[in-house]
Amino acid sequence: MIELLVVIAIIALLMAILMPALSKVKDQARQIACIANLRQWNFVFNNYINDNDGKFYSGCNDLGYYWPWQLDRAEQDWKINKTWFCPTAKTPVWNEQGVQKESLYITDAWGIEKPSTTGAPASMTYQGRTYTLNRNGLNGSYGLNGYILSIPKTGSFEGGLPSTEGYRDMYNVPNASEVPVFLDALRFDFWPQADQAPAMNEYEFWQNGAQYNMARVCINRHRGFTSSSFLDWSVRRVGLKELWKLKWHRNFDVNGPWTKAGGVQPSNWPEWLRRFKDY
C-alpha cells in the first residue's frame, strides 16, 4: 500500500513538472500553424497586387471599408477557407442563427458577418463594380492593416489621416519588412496610430471607436507575441509592445509615447502587459 502511494505521488509530481512544458509546446504549435495561415494569405494578396499593377484592394467605399467583399467568394467563405482562423480563436461572436455570445474574449473570432447576423451587406457597388458576399458570410480571427488599402487619392482613412499616409504602390514601399499586412486581430481591418493605448483588460474584446484600433491588434493569443505578415511577404512573431515600433503608415512615429525611445514607463502599461519585453 505504501509503495502504491509512493508511485502515485511520483506520478503526480511528474505531471506537475511536465504539464507547463506540454502546454508551452502546444502553444508553440498553434503559433506555427498561425504563421502558416498567414503565409497562405501572402499568396492571395501578392497575386492580387501582381494582377492590379501594384495596387491593393480598395475596399468598397472611400474609407476602404468592406475590403473582404472584393475577395473571390471561395476565399471569403470561412467554411471553405480555413486559413481565416488563428488556431487559438475559432469560435465566432455571432453564431449562424444570429445569436451573439454572452461574453466576448480575445480568443473569439470576429464573425459571422452576413445579412442575417450582423446586418452585413449582401453586395456592394463601388467605382462601377459590384462585389457579392458568399452565402456563409465572413468569419475569422485575422485582420488587415487598413493603411495598405488603395482608397482615393483625395480621401482619408479612418481616424482622419489622408490617403498619402498609406502605401498606394506596393512595388515601391520603403522598409517593407516593417510594414505589417495581416495579423491576429479582433476585426478584419484596423488603422492604428502611435498614441493609441492598449486595452486595460487582457481578455477584453474590442470596443467601438477609432481610438481603439491598436487595442484590436494588441491581443495576447501567443504568450506575449502575435503573428504578422509584412509587405516584403515575410511572416514572423511580433512582441505585443513591438506593435508600436512597426511602420503602420508612412509617417507612423516608431518612437512614439508607447516606446522606450518615446519615454514610456513600466507603470504606463496595463498590468497584464508589464511582464512582456519593451521596445
Per-region residue spans from a language model:
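Short, well-structured segments within or immediately adjacent to enzyme catalytic domains
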Residues: 32-279
